[in-house]
Amino acid sequence: MCGFSRRFDESYRAAYKKVENGLIGRPSVLRSQTCDKHDPSGFYVEYASWSGGVFVDMAVHDIDLTLWFFGSDIIPKSISAYGLTAVTPDLKKHNDFDNAVGIVEFWNGKIAYYYCSRMMAHGQEDVTEIIGTEGKLSVNLNPADNLVNYYHAGGITREVPATYWGRFEQAFVRETQEFVDACLDDTPLPMKLGNAVKAVQIGAWLQEALVSGKQLKFDETGRRVEASKI
């Protein structure tokens, strides 16, 4: 079992059930982001020295969602990525970025778009849209920490979670419960380890495309058309 917390989130599970029931037709495009609140302390610079890069560290959760909603058998056709250091230029010494966009085209006619950021001013903003041939689903499109809106002379204020933990706290609890159930009662796990490995592999390819500035291409078996450049 691997700790992809979004698979244990009630909203993502509800969205998956709707996809499974055919409510949006054939899922064709997935647009997903992991955006952290800006931390000016320099933590992310030190962290980048061993994290594997923004796509391996952050987008891996969005990639796992892609394998969940599109099917774990999907094969990349091309991978492109672009990034910048808008607020933390010291990340460059680790070949990392505080904002990055990645696009993965799959051989079965599906596309995934990922956005990662470490400079959100307001708080944690993790959003996903699954666009199908007959409809669309969104998860957390309007982030909120709770159901309270504060109405005042300047407008309406709604708080959002400050951290990843704040957004997925209950998912972490459920994940622990299901892991314990699997250990004690031999209940089925909600994912296979091979899917986790595949998510990390795609994340590593995105990071390679980001650092090299090159588009990566694959044949229909998933084999690289050309060798790695980094």
List each model region and its residues.
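Glycine- and charged-residue-rich phosphate/anionic-cofactor binding loop of Rossmann-like
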Residues: C2, V160-Y164, A182-A199
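Short, hydrophobic secondary-structure boundary micro-motifs
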Residues: P27, I79, V160, P190-K192, ...
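A generic short alpha-helical patch detector that favors 3-5-residue windows
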Residues: R167-A171
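Predominantly a Rossmann-like dinucleotide-binding segment in NAD(P)-dependent oxidoreductases
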Residues: M1, R6-H94, G213
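Glycine-/small-residue-rich active-site loops that bind phosphorylated ligands and cofactors
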Residues: R7, M119, K198
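Contiguous beta-strand/loop segments that form the cofactor/metal-binding neighborhood of enzyme cores
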Residues: D64-D145, V173-L189, A204-L206, D219-I230
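Short arginine-rich
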Residues: I202-S212
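Mobile, glycine-enriched helix-loop/loop "lid" segments at the mouths of ligand-binding/catalytic clefts
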Residues: R31-Q33, K136-T157
